[in-house]
Design a protein with these regions (language model features):
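Short secondary-structure boundary/capping segments
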Residues: 1, 44-51
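Cysteine-dependent PTP/DSP-like catalytic domain, specifically the C-terminal lobe
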Residues: 1-16, 20-24, 29, 71-72
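Active-site catalytic pocket residues across diverse enzymes, especially alpha/beta-hydrolases
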Residues: 21, 47, 102
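Adenosyl-5′-phosphate
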Residues: 26-32, 38, 51, 55-222
Length: 222
């Protein structure tokens, strides 16, 4: 129900995981970690926020849009296999508590430092303090590169330009991968439902338009 790149990329491994749980276990309730990045400013691009005020605004904006991205992905993947999703980080009391924290405590440190510190003694050090990696990046080193390669073969230059024109200025595709997802969305829902996705998930404060966290890491280190 989305043509957003990072949503589609992450949906594939989560859908497969939910399918495996349904077919190979007796579990029907699954805990999932959606929400912590939105609530605590955990995405890597937040390190580039030029001020605390802009950090705080983007923090709130990401939370308000979660139903279009990670929330949508998690709900549909679990629901498609009859699983009940439990998202502790989206508990109303947890959200209210975290959003009342001084924003400066969320900045200038490793992503979600406050949350990591809360689990000291419960998780191994190497897991607790490793750098954040996006789901679509972390499931395998080749997943994102292979899907880019595939979509580049099925969307030629002329079709890419045609799809860009059909976007009519709304969430215009910047890559052939985005164009492929947009075309599939149109085939399923028609071209008059584009507005349901108000924006494409992209990092801020950087020239990178691809949502891959690894690309942001590489640019920062270079």
């Amino acid at each position: 129900e989305s043509y957003d790149t990072t949503t589609v990329r992450a949906s594939v491994p989560m859908w497969l995981l939910c399918k495996y749980i349904k077919e190979n276990t007796k579990c029907r309730y699954i805990f999932s970690g959606e929400g912590s990045d939105e609530i605590l400013g955990g995405y890597l691009y937040f390190h580039h926020a030029p001020s605390t005020e802009e950090f705080a605004y983007e923090n709130m904006r990401r939370l308000h849009l979660i139903h279009q991205f990670d929330g949508l992905r998690a709900d549909r993947c679990a629901g498609a296999h009859g699983l009940d999703l439990i998202v502790p980080f989206l508990d109303k009391r947890f959200i209210e508590s975290c959003m009342s924290i001084d924003q400066n405590l969320k900045r200038d440190a490793i992503e979600k430092k406050i949350l990591r510190e809360a689990f000291i003694g419960y998780l191994p050090h190497e897991i607790l303090w490793r750098q954040k990696d996006g789901m679509s990046d972390a499931v395998g080193t080749n997943w994102v590169s292979e899907v880019k390669e595939y979509t580049g073969t099925v969307i030629d230059d002329s079709l890419f330009e045609e799809i860009q024109t059909k976007c009519k200025g709304h969430n215009v595709c910047l890559s052939k991968e985005e164009a492929y997802y947009r075309e599939q969305f149109w085939l399923m829902y028609g071209t008059d439902q584009d507005h349901l996705i108000t924006e494409i998930w992209r990092p801020k404060w950087t020239t990178i338009t691809d949502p891959s966290a690894r690309l942001l890491i590489e640019k920062t280190h270079n």
